[in-house]
Amino acid sequence: PHDGENQTNTAVTSPAIAPSQTPLPPISTPTPTPPPVPSPDVGGGASSTVPDANPEHLKNAPLYITSILDPDDKSLPRLDCPRPDISRYQYLKPSTTLKKPKFFIALNIREKADLLPRLLGSIVEALHFLGPENCALSIVEGNSGDGTYEILHLLRPEIEKLGTEYHFSRSDLDPGAGDRIPKLAELRNMALAPLVSGGPSKYAADAVVLFLNDVAICLEDILELAHQRLYLGADMTCGFDWTYVGADPTFYDVWISRTIAGDSFFEIPADGNWNSAWNIFWNEDTSRRRFFDHKPLQVFSCWNGAVAMTARPLLDRLVRFRAPSPGECFQGEPQLFCKDLWNAGFGKIAVVPSVDLEYSDEAGRKIKAAKGYTSQWVGREDEVQDFRVDWKADPPEKVKCMARYDKQTWEPWNQALE
C-alpha cells in the first residue's frame, strides 16, 4: 500500500497519482489464506494447484519467474541497476549459517506484475547476498487481476529451493471501501504475522525487518538501508519516495513523514496545494543541509517506500500497525507505528537521502537519472565530518496533525498514549 494514499479517506487532497500507484484490493475475509504449494514445474501442469488462477496468466508466469531469478535476464523491461559494492556490504551477511533467520523481508502488493522483475528480482538478489537460509520472505497479495498472484504463487518452489522461508498469502481486504487506515494496518500486520507469531524462539535476537512498498528498487538500495541502520546505530531507516505530478519529482510520503521538529517535510497550505514541494525542510536548517549533503538525518516519522528496522519491538510485541485511537489525530498507520516506536524507546529513526525510489520502472529510471543511484553518493563516510546522526533522545513536544489540509493543528507527540 502506498502511504500517501491514506489521504483518500480524508478531506486532504493530493496531486494526481501515477497510474502505476493503484490502491489495494477488494477482499472478502480479513485473514490471509496460504495457497497450496504448487508443483515445481511452473508450466501448464501447475494450474490445478493454483486456486482461482487465470490460465493466461499462468502461461505467462514462467517468463516473469525467469526474469526474477536471473538479474542478467533482458526478456522483460525493468529499471537497470548497478552491481553493489560487495566490500561495503559484505559484513551484513552472517559469517556462519544461522540457526534462525536474521532478515525478514515483508511486502504488500497488488496489480504490479510489470514491476515484479525489478522488485522481486532485487529481493532475490538480496536473498543470495545475505544468505538465503538467513532470510525469510513474507508477501501478502491482494486479489490481483494482472498476473501478480500467479507469478508470486508459482515462485514459491524457486524461493524454497534457495533455502529461504517463503510465506505467501492472499487477502480480500479492500482499503478503498470504508475506513481505510484500519485495513492498511491489518494488511501490514498480515505481512509481519510470521515474524510476530514465530517470536524470539524462531528469529534471531538481532533480526532486521526490510519492509518494502511496491517500488522500483535496486539491491544496493535495500543493502544501503540495512547498512545505514547499523552504521548509524538507528532503530529504523527509510529511503525517500518520489512521484511525478509534473516535470519535476515531488516528495511523495508527506502525509506520513514528520521532521524531528514535528513538522511536515514541506509546507502544505490550507488549500492543499503542493506548490512548495520543492522547498523541502524549509524551516529546519540542519535537516535541510544534511538532506542536500546526502547525509542521513533524524526524523520523528517516515516510511517513504522502503524501511530497514530492528525487529526487536515486534518480536517483543511492543508495537504493531494500528489505526488512530479515539481522541487521537487522524493519521496514517506508518506514522502511528513510528509514534509507538518512540513511546517504546526506539526513537532513533532516520531518513537516508542517498536512497531514492519511485513506483514504476519508467518513473524509477527518471528518479535515478534526476537524483542519482545510491552508489553515486555513498562511501568513505568515516572521512566525512558529522556524517553520523547526533541523535536526539526526546521526540518533539508537538507534532503537526494533518487530518485535513484546511484544519492543521499541533498536537502532543504522545496524544492518546498518556
What are the residue ranges of the model-derived segments?
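Catalytic donor-sugar/metal-binding loop of nucleotide-sugar-dependent glycosyltransferases
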Residues: 296-298, 305-307, 312-316, 323-358
